């Protein structure tokens, strides 16, 4: 790598599971995979070369208040990952930086769009 931050492809997934039946506690896991690519030399037609792949899983525990069951899916798959994303992003960028690669800024994820995309595929 010539010191220029690689182009980063970020793949994000979210999952949620109830910790115990009939309990209001849930574990929400945010999985992030960053793949850094550079174009070798000055040839814009050259195929990008992968220089790193970093994967993390970051989870949070959430208790859903009584009366919020009708919003359960959006609470767990939109609001909860939105809350834990900044810390997960920080850890991912630290991992890449400590591996010796220049870091590129990772923009916030649109968890509403991700949720709609997952629902459309289901």
Residue ranges and their predicted role:
Residues 1-83, 89-122:
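N-terminal intrinsically disordered, cationic/polar leader segments
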